[in-house]
Curated annotation (Swiss-Prot):
Name of the featured protein: 2-oxo-4-hydroxy-4-carboxy-5-ureidoimidazoline decarboxylase
Subunit structure: Homodimer.
Ligand binding (substrate): 68, 84-88, 119-123
EC number: 4.1.1.97
Gene Ontology CC: one annotated term: peroxisome
Catalytic activity of the protein: 5-hydroxy-2-oxo-4-ureido-2,5-dihydro-1H-imidazole-5-carboxylate + H(+) = (S)-allantoin + CO2
Length: 175
């Protein structure tokens, strides 16, 4: 899909197309639709980021809570969104051995107990070892710092999901 097509989508089509660029949060797509026309994918991405940043703390935490636990119950039940399943598969989280799975479950539980929302990281930019390391490290963050970190990871996920949907025009260079 190119930007001309993006900008011509009806409200319903836009929300259907972009409703999961922020995991299980179609309200984000619904909110930014009225900002059309977008000059390019970066403009759309910036609009989404600005909307998320403008939310009160409870709204930002709500967005983070829409994400599943990594390698968690939803993965085992087959209840992940297609995007999340692909991202977790790419990071190697669907093939954890028993030891790594137990460690992931333990750290996820500790994290959720400490912060009140699931650990979010852009799985496509990390592998299972890096994810386990970051999860353990981020347990030491202060709550406000960790909420901001989680929101920045949500934005990275959003950026990659937008790239999956929108064709970016090729860069033409003179040789």
């Amino acid at each position: 899909m190119d930007m001309r097509q993006v900008n011509s989508l009806s409200y319903e089509e836009f929300v259907e197309t972009f409703g999961n660029v922020v995991e299980r949060c179609p309200v984000v797509a619904a909110a930014v639709w009225s900002g059309r026309p977008f000059a390019n994918s970066h403009d759309l991405e910036a609009s989404i980021g600005e909307f998320i940043d403008s939310l009160p703390v409870a709204g930002q935490e709500g967005i983070v809570r829409c994400h599943p636990d990594l390698a968690g119950r939803d993965l085992k039940r087959g209840a992940l969104t297609a995007e999340s399943r692909g991202e977790q598969t790419q990071a190697g989280l669907t093939l954890l051995d028993a030891g790594d799975a137990a460690r992931m479950n333990r750290l996820n539980a500790q994290y959720k107990e400490r912060f009140g929302f699931p650990f979010v990281i852009c799985a496509r930019m990390n592998n299972k070892e890096e994810i386990l390391l970051r999860l353990a490290e981020r347990l030491g963050n202060e709550p406000a710092q960790e909420r901001q970190c989680a929101i920045e990871e949500v934005k990275k996920i959003c950026q990659l999901r937008l790239q999956d949907i929108i064709q970016c025009p090729a860069t033409h260079t003179k040789l």
